[in-house]
């Protein structure tokens, strides 16, 4: 830890600006292990990230070289989520699927449903 602190450290905002990505993307890189970082106070979860310039350069080099062609094709072929066409699995059909599942899992009765607020007497085969 002291090794990192002795070098010139960068905040998350400064590191993101150097790399050319957003701060959220930089946080995701930290979670994925793409970039090495140190917390200002390692004993606190909410402690801010600290980066070195060397770690930023290494992360950029490694992130460019580790993407395979198939991953790049997947990234390029992603479609906008707000398309006009409703497909199975979207929010609209998910509601419909939940409703159908609820109907299938509902408790079934052999007889008609009875209201217990009326004075109707039940016949239990006596």
Swiss-Prot record:
Top-level taxon of the source organism: Viruses
Organism: Acyrthosiphon pisum secondary endosymbiont phage 1 (Bacteriophage APSE-1)
Gene name of the record: 40
GO function terms (MF aspect): DNA binding
Chaperone as UniProt keyword: no
Polar residues composition bias: residue spans: 114-126
Record SUPFAM superfamilies: Putative DNA-binding domain
Role this protein plays: Excisionase and integrase are necessary for the excision of prophage from the host genome by site-specific recombination.
GO biological process: one example: DNA recombination
Keyword Glycoprotein assigned: no
Swiss-Prot/TrEMBL keywords: DNA recombination, DNA-binding, Viral genome excision
Disordered: annotated span: 99-126
Name of the featured protein: Probable excisionase
InterPro entries registered for this protein in UniProt: DNA-bd_dom_put_sf, Lambda_DNA-bd_dom_sf
């Amino acid at each position: 830890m002291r090794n990192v602190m002795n070098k010139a450290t960068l905040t998350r905002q400064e590191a993101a600006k150097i790399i050319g990505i957003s701060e959220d993307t930089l946080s995701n890189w930290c979670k994925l292990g793409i970039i090495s970082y140190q917390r200002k106070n390692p004993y606190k979860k909410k402690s801010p990230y600290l980066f070195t310039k060397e770690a930023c350069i290494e992360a950029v080099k490694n992130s460019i070289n580790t993407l395979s062609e198939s991953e790049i094709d997947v990234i390029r072929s992603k479609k906008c989520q707000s398309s006009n066409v409703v497909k199975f699995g979207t929010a609209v059909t998910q509601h419909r699927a939940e409703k159908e599942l609820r109907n299938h899992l509902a408790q079934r009765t052999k007889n008609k449903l009875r209201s217990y607020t009326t004075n109707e007497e039940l016949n239990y085969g006596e």
